[in-house]
């Protein structure tokens, strides 16, 4: 009986297919293109010494890409099916030892240990997270897809012109000394 139940859970996870534009708790899910994921991590200069956190991590592509670079990475995602899919994809990519996914609310997540935040969120989400950003240690890097942090000036901006159809701008912010 236990084997049948486990088999049913695995099948349900395999049957889950995220759809771009599906409604989430605080935003719709739109995946960042693989090319822009790499551009964002390049802009943030992610190394094996980094701890990358992605709030609203979706299918885990940013976390998995950071882990492939040797960084430890954490994805915080509200949708439990997305969390399970992300864990499965991390196992398949061979980075489950460095890529962790938790079910949770991005507004309640502890981001204090991050050296890099990688985000694709709407301006209203970023505005709501701003107090958490301001509490981060100096030197922490925040890299965002397309939507900048309201009223913050990015330290660097790069637009991807190839291999990206929409939402193709990476912006980097560095937390200044206090």
Cite the ranges covered by each PLM segment:
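Bacterial N-terminal signal peptides
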Residues: 1-7
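S-adenosyl-L-methionine
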Residues: 10-50, 80-113
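Conserved class I S-adenosyl-L-methionine
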Residues: 49-58
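Conserved SAM-binding loop of SAM-dependent methyltransferases across substrates and taxa
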Residues: 59-71
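Conserved SAM-binding motif I beta-strand of class I
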Residues: 72-77
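A short SAM/SAH-binding and catalytic strip from SAM-dependent methyltransferases
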Residues: 112-128
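C-terminal substrate-binding/active-site "lid" region of AdoMet-derived donor-dependent transferases
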Residues: 124-178
């Amino acid at each position: 009986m236990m084997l049948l139940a486990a088999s049913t859970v695995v099948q349900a996870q395999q049957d889950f297919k995220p759809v771009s534009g599906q409604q989430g708790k605080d935003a719709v899910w739109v995946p960042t293109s693989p090319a822009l994921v790499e551009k964002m991590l390049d802009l943030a200069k992610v190394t094996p010494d980094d701890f990358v956190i992605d709030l609203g991590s979706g299918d885990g592509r940013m976390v998995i890409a950071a882990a492939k670079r040797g960084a430890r990475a954490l994805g915080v995602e509200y949708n439990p099916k997305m969390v399970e899919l992300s864990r499965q994809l991390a196992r398949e990519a061979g980075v489950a030892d460095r890529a962790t996914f938790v079910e949770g609310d991005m507004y309640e997540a502890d981001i204090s240990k991050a050296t890099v935040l990688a985000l694709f969120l709407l301006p209203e989400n970023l505005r709501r997270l701003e107090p958490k950003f301001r509490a981060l240690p100096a030197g922490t890097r925040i890299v965002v897809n397309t939507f900048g942090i309201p009223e913050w000036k990015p330290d660097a901006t790069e637009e991807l012109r190839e291999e990206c159809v929409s939402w193709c701008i990476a912006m980097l912010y560095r937390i200044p000394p206090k």
